Amino acid sequence: MNPLIQELTQEQLRTDIPAFRPGDTVRVHAKVVEGTRERIQLFEGVVIKRRGAGISETYTVRKVSNGVGVERTFPLHTPRVAQIEVVRYGKVRRAKLYYLRALHGKAARIKEIRR
């Protein structure tokens, strides 16, 4: 890769991101712009996948809201996310948890790791 591009991407990488993996429950504080106002919107759910590397890395968070599954994909190093909190660590044996889409209720629970 071009050294100039490498240097620019290194400057934009965030260092305040906690370590989390698929299966973990996270609370994402996303900045939302509505007209001239900017506010923080919380999105809490299970990380079902992480993909990419470096500046282009993304993660997808899934939650069930009013009986409807909602998935939202965030870039990892975006300034549009104010903060990421890890609520609990889950124990899973897969990197992509797409099977959670078909499960409901207690079957969709993930075993918790105590840390």
From Swiss-Prot:
Please name the InterPro entries in this protein's record: Ribosomal_bL19 (IPR001857), Ribosomal_bL19_CS (IPR018257), Ribosomal_bL19_sf (IPR038657), Translation_prot_SH3-like_sf (IPR008991)
Specify the species: Enterococcus faecalis (strain ATCC 700802 / V583)
| Gene Ontology MF: a single term | structural constituent of ribosome
Q: Which GO terms describe its cellular component?
A: cytosolic large ribosomal subunit
Question: Does the entry feature the keyword Ribosomal protein, yes or no?
Answer: yes
Q: Sorted alphabetically, which keywords does the UniProt record give?
A: Ribonucleoprotein, Ribosomal protein
The family note in this entry says: Belongs to the bacterial ribosomal protein bL19 family.
Say which domain of life the source belongs to: Bacteria
Is Ribonucleoprotein one of the keywords? yes
Please state what the protein is called.
Answer: Large ribosomal subunit protein bL19
Gene symbol here is: rplS
**What exactly does this protein do?**
This protein is located at the 30S-50S ribosomal subunit interface and may play a role in the structure and function of the aminoacyl-tRNA binding site.
A Gene Ontology BP annotation from the UniProt entry: translation
Sorted alphabetically, which Pfam families does this protein's record hold? Ribosomal_L19
* PROSITE patterns xref list: RIBOSOMAL_L19
